[in-house]
A protein has these predicted regions:
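Terminal targeting segments of Actinobacterial cell-envelope proteins
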Residues: 1-26
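Hydrophobic single-pass membrane-insertion segments
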Residues: 43-56
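Acidic/proline-rich low-complexity IDRs
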Residues: 1, 40-42, 74
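N-terminal targeting/disorder module
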Residues: 4-8, 38, 50, 201
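Hydrophobic membrane-insertion alpha-helices, especially the h-region
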Residues: 29-45
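N-terminal export signals and maturation junctions of secreted/periplasmic proteins
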Residues: 53-135
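Catalytic glycan-binding domains that act on GlcNAc-containing polysaccharides
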Residues: 106-291
Length: 291
């Protein structure tokens, strides 16, 4: 398991104590991303970008060792820490008033109803399906579609980076591949591990698909999210479920601030990455309440 840095844990504890002294407000368990994370990451005021980067943040980094020196100064409680980030409103993915409709129809209707949040219905169906799947196999994780959407936005703008779009089958019309992980441009050097099977590169690995899995990570976490018998890192249904399993690993409960932070930080070891995912997940939660 990737080790959550002691500095972050200390900051979360400081914020929790501060909240206890600030009028006794209680944070609801139902919050997807609770106010402690906002405070720890300085998200009281945050400019939210509306488009994904040209490429993913890049690659997995080495796990942080327990012995790593912690020289971070104590964190002052930032303004706005009492604000609770918005959580999804309305019916859960797949819910319906028509008991005779199949799950695909339910997910489509649910996604169509949330088109105003700024995510294509096809991507929303994948995120909603992943929430349903993980709720069934790892109910203690409390994974929400908004966390997956936050990651999908940062990684590839929901499978549309570079001007492509998602097809009806959930695959980008043009494949999405990150730069070669050859040790240049601050990327980790990862020689080819898949013979080019997933990323088309027989010299170095590349991040692949809507959620930018690198081949060796995909081999461990691959999933068949749409039941077509194929686990495809280019299929948003498959990668959304795989990402859900990755985030929920090691018994994490994403309704807890520290676990949510650890999960997203494990996906990419950058504080700026966690801030971006948080901001976009929070934005989608707020927009889901706007109608």
């Amino acid at each position: 398991m990737l080790v959550l840095r002691r500095a972050v844990i200390r900051r979360l504890r400081l914020l929790w104590k501060a909240l206890g002294r600030s009028g006794g407000r209680l944070l609801t368990q139902g919050a997807l991303t609770v106010a402690l994370i906002a405070g720890a990451l300085g998200l009281a005021v945050y400019a939210v970008p509306h488009a994904g980067p040209d490429w993913a943040y890049g690659e997995e980094t080495e796990p942080v060792a327990d012995s790593e020196q912690d020289d971070d100064p104590p964190l002052a409680v930032p303004p706005g820490v009492d604000a609770i980030p918005c959580v999804p409103a309305g019916p859960a993915p797949g819910s319906t008033t028509d008991p005779n409709s199949d799950m695909d129809s339910r997910l489509k209707a649910w996604a169509d109803n949330l088109a105003h949040v700024g995510i294509s219905p096809r991507a929303l169906q994948a995120y909603g399906n992943a929430e349903i799947v993980l709720a069934g196999v790892k109910p203690q994780c409390h994974l929400s579609w908004t966390t997956l959407a936050g990651i999908g936005s940062v990684e590839t703008n929901h499978g549309t980076t570079g001007g492509t779009s998602l097809g009806a089958d959930g695959r980008p019309v043009e494949q999405i591949r990150g730069p070669a992980l050859d040790g240049t441009n601050n990327n980790k050097r990862i020689p080819d591990t898949d013979g080019g099977e997933y990323d088309g590169d027989t010299k170095f690995d590349r991040a692949v698909g809507p959620m930018q899995f690198i081949p060796q990570t995909w081999e461990r976490w691959k999933a068949d999210g749409d039941g077509d018998g194929v686990s495809d890192p280019n299929d948003i249904d498959d990668v959304a479920v795989a990402a859900g399993h990755y985030l929920c690993a090691d018994g994490r409960d994403l309704s807890r601030a520290a676990d949510w932070y650890a999960a997203v930080f494990a996906y990419n070891h950058l504080d700026s990455y966690v801030r971006d995912v948080y901001a976009r997940a929070d934005e989608y939660g707020k927009k889901s309440r706007s109608r």
